Structure formats: structure tokens, C-alpha cells
């Protein structure tokens, strides 16, 4: 199966299936000298771990990670970093009836059409547990970005028709849905419980803000920063749309409303070019402009629902289906760290790519050694 690797200079390969023995990631291109421990990675994994609240799946996996290579004495060595976790709470018997039945909204039919064979236990490679490898790599990328003063933070913008009305990012970790608005979070939790009681599910929007990003990241024409970020986020199974800055609202604006006016700002470090607004979401012409990068990702409702649905099977019979097993009534809260990770992976990859864009970057590294 091709398509399990992402990135150029910071190359991430994920492996494993939902009901297989283990999952993880191999990350190549990690510079030597980044402080990294299993605890650093575990903090990220715990944010997507199942079984942590009433609004997530009851599948209770510890998701404890182990670093197998690429780290010595608490620092990355410059060799590929391999991190793996073991699956411990599979209940594969819950999926026996799905061996030949196609679940609506899932990848079953597509996988059968492409490969003529599929791992039907929890979706196999198309399961949300595949994102464990992304979060591992995202934790590593975030450690590197921290050293550059770049911070990436994702959060729940909405669940169903409940939207956050404020952006108090410190409140995200204080509620089960990672919303930056505690009042909206309470309403969202009640809405999730209603959907769960109805044997149904919900979707939502995940927002992400990256601050401290230097101007100049992005490679014209086909590797624009927003193009690479879009590809990264759209590769997450539950994501159905991505927008930057004002997003689709720009279609209703005039040019004078959409254009971000520039001005000169002066501080102790000198003169800086700034923007008065940020309709562009921090990216102009596919290149970062130094403003915060603002992203929204649309997340579809969880397709695994207990409500009866019409479907077909592999022997061309129309059948009724009520999905058993342990599933999230909404994946948005657990997908927050996945979106955050894909943004961090992409930004650090582009930082490394950008090192070769100018000769003075090369001279800063090598001039004293010549």
C-alpha cells in the first residue's frame, strides 16, 4: 500500500491498523540535538487517547509509547526516530458481520474496489487509530518548532450547531471537547449526549492558529504553504474541507474588504512590516507573511452509528445495518491534536525546505567552517 508517507525534508511514515498488534511512526530527517523523551510524545498521545470521557469511545487503550531509535541521552541523534505503541483493547468479534457488508460513510467499498481485500476489523488502515503515527510525528515537530519560537494550537470551533463565541485558548484543556469557550463547551457536551442517545453522531469544525511563523515559508508554485497545509489536513480521514483566514467568506467580499492593509510597526528591535487585518490567514501568494496562520477544518459526523441504515454487501444483496462496537459519537475533540500535529509537521518540513532558498542561509551554517 503506497501513500503512507508525508513530507520532504521531514519525512513521516505511519504504520499499523486498528486491530493489529501495534501502530506507530518512523520519522526521517529529524535534526540532531532536539530534546525528546517518551513523556514529550505521551502528552500529545494522551490528548487523542480513547476512553477518557463520556463523549468519546469506550475503547480504553493506554496508548503508551516507546521510542525504539533516533534518541540517545535525551537528544535526537539525526537518525530516523521510530516510535511505537501496542494495541491492547481490540474486540474484533464486534466486526464479524462486516466481513462482507459495506458500512455507509466508511472506506470499505473503496478498499475492496482497489485491493480486492480489506481488513474489516475497525476499518484497518482507514481507522482513526492510524492518526497515532501522525500525533507521534507532530509531537517531535512541535518540539523543534518550540526552539524556533513557533507555537501551533488547535481547538474545537464548533460541534454540530454549537459554536464557540470566545477564543480563550487557556480554557481548551479544561473541558472534554477542547473548546475555548466553557459555556459553549457545556452546550456541546449536552448535544453530544443527545446524539449518542439517538444512536447517531455529530461533526464540527476544528480551528488552528500558528504564531511566531517567520515570513518566507512556502515554495511556489505547486508547493505553496497553504497547498501543503491543505494536503496535510485533508489527508486526515474525517476532514472534508479546509479554509484559511476569511476562507469561503472572501467570495462575498470586495477587494478593498479582503485586502489586508500593510503598515510599519516600530519596537525595541526596529521596524517591522505588519498587517492591520488578517483576511489572508497569514499566507500571501503561498508564502507566510509573518502574521498568525489561521486555519479551519470541517470534520464530518462519525460514520459508525448504531442507528439502522440501508446498505449492501459484497454479494450484491441489499441489507439493513446497525453497527456494533465502541465508537465516538463525535471525533472532533480527539481530532484536535491530529490537526495540530499535521500543521506542525508541515511547518517544520517547510522550515527545513526554506533553508536552501537563499545563499546567506547556507553561509550562516558553513561560512565559519570554510
Report each predicted region and the residues it spans.
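N-terminal, positively charged regions that mediate nucleic acid binding
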Residues: 1-59
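Internal helix-turn-beta structural module
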Residues: 11, 83, 304-370
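Glycine-rich anion/phosphate-binding loop at the beta-strand->alpha-helix junction
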Residues: 18-21, 199-202, 206-318
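Alpha-helical support elements that line or immediately flank enzyme active sites
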Residues: 21-33, 128-150, 223, 227-231, ...
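Glycine-rich, N-terminal phosphate-binding loop and its surrounding beta-alpha-beta segment
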Residues: 45-104, 108
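A structural-propensity feature for long, helix-poor, extended segments
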Residues: 51-70, 76, 163-166, 171-183, ...
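Short acidic, glycine/tyrosine-flanked loop/strand segments centered on an H-E-D-like triad
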Residues: 99-124, 309-329
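Glycine-rich, mobile lid/loop segments that gate access to catalytic sites or pores
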Residues: 113-221
